Amino acid sequence: MAHIPSGGAPAAGAAPMGPQYCVCKVELSVSGQNLLDRDVTSKSDPFCVLFTENNGRWIEYDRTETAINNLNPAFSKKFVLDYHFEEVQKLKFALFDQDKSSMRLDEHDFLGQFSCSLGTIVSSKKITRPLLLLNDKPAGKGLITIAAQELSDNRVITLSLAGRRLDKKDLFGKSDPFLEFYKPGDDGKWMLVHRTEVIKYTLDPVWKPFTVPLVSLCDGDMEKPIQVMCYDYDNDGGHDFIGEFQTSVSQMCEARDSVPLEFECINPKKQRKKKNYKNSGIIILRSCKINRDYSFLDYILGGCQLMFTVGIDFTASNGNPLDPSSLHYINPMGTNEYLSAIWAVGQIIQDYDSDKMFPALGFGAQLPPDWKVSHEFAINFNPTNPFCSGVDGIAQAYSACLPHIRFYGPTNFSPIVNHVARFAAQATQQRTATQYFILLIITDGVISDMEETRHAVVQASKLPMSIIIVGVGNADFAAMEFLDGDSRMLRSHTGEEAARDIVQFVPFREFRNAAKETLAKAVLAELPQQVVQYFKHKNLPPTNSEPA
């Protein structure tokens, strides 16, 4: 989105000013219970150290204050971290009994530690876990409790404004008025926050309602002064000043649809020169509404679970899994492109599902005992319970099923898309933002049932569901790009348009020589936005959300 620099000329219909993105920060609060008592004459004096993992090494990130003589501390110092959904952010919390004033940790008694990912904490909002010693044995009865909170003001303010009897500035016409909104900057100068569009040839303009983040308009401070300037637009950039007034968000909140607020637009020069000067027109605030613009993290902290399903392509084009040239051949390192894709996506998403039980389905193979082709079978051969325990369970079931099936065809996606869509449709009956379904399809080739798949994806776009397709091997994946509606919205063969873009396609070959984290980032890049987009469209707030 283009922004007009401060002092530049606003085009008619200019875009809103201010940041259009949210830097997501998470605050972690830590407390301990029943900590080991390392002091002889008194209780321990614990403090907590947070370590983050960087290239396999633990790096100290921050530490809390020391709680004197306390085996059940609640630390007031918080840990603040940037949150990245598409990464596994490993954390280690270590507690020590302070013995000296030294900053060196080896000079303090170790009380226990706990390691997990940031995603694990965020998905539960609050966790309590046993502390472990360096030999992984329990640190007595010691426990650690970690609570997560998003550090962002997600409120947005929507203003609807008009003008009445503004000063005429053009010699042969009326005025072309627009408004600018300013807030006080840290340097004491006024900082431009928003500029409205220009309304041509009128002294009684009605501007389009606009929405800006509350933190952009007033830093979240409802009493902070806001300066509003009214100008007559000139093509040469020398806009003529009409007048100004000051207000605050708390004052503007008094405006309602039935009771507008009116502000006199004052030109100080005219006010000083003319004794009978009244004003240079009236600015009318027709309505002021504050709402919450919920983020992906709001929904996760609100208890939304990500329901993960894997669909694996077992068609003959993959090659015999015993042949090293086959895409299903498991190399001496115990992996292949299918397993790499499962790990890359699954290790992120499994942190956001409390029971970590994931259905794993296959398609395009002949199954024993009658060797009929199936496009929707449980790879653990248990159709009533296709669930695998975590990503490890999916990998084990995948490896175990390979010798027992015959690769066949064709490459039909629609049965598995419809399978997950049925569960997503059931979840909508709850009318809450508690479940969102993610289908990972890993395939080596061209879709055989493109019309049926297009129809299935268009129908799924109305549900709490996203589809990630990872293409393995070196086939032509042009059809997959067609399903990924980044450039244009997908339509079914009947002409029905998808409600939103829910497909993300990534060719594995582009990541063969990259770090494994790179694939996860690319594959999951659009998912948070898709989750938020769906729940917003359905007007479903996070389950524990506060009113604005």
UniProtKB/Swiss-Prot annotation:
Predominant cellular place of this UniProt entry's protein: cytoplasm
Keywords: Calcium, Cell membrane, Cytoplasm, Membrane, Metal-binding, Nucleus, Repeat
Annotated Ca(2+) 2 binding sites: D39, D97, D99, D109
SMART domains documented for this protein: C2, VWA
Cofactor note: Binds 3 Ca(2+) ions per C2 domain.
Residue ranges constituting the C2 domain according to the UniProt record: 5-131, 138-263
Cofactor(s), names only, from the UniProt record: Ca(2+)
Location relative to the cell: Cytoplasm; Nucleus; Cell membrane
All residue ranges annotated as the VWFA domain in the record: 305-507
Alphabetical list of SUPFAM superfamilies matching this protein: C2 domain (Calcium/lipid-binding domain, CaLB), vWA-like
Residues the entry annotates as binding Ca(2+) 1: D39, D45, D97, D99
Binding-site residues, Ca(2+) 3: D99, S102, D109
Record-level Gene Ontology MF annotations: calcium-dependent phospholipid binding; metal ion binding
Cross-referenced Pfam families: C2 (PF00168), Copine (PF07002)
UniProt GO BP: cellular response to calcium ion
GO CC annotation terms, alphabetical: cytoplasm; extracellular exosome; nucleus; plasma membrane
Function: Calcium-dependent phospholipid-binding protein that plays a role in calcium-mediated intracellular processes. Exhibits calcium-dependent cell membrane binding properties.
PANTHER family in UniProt: COPINE, COPINE-2
Similarity section: Belongs to the copine family.
The protein, known as: Copine-2
Source organism (scientific name): Homo sapiens (Human)
Gene responsible for this protein: CPNE2
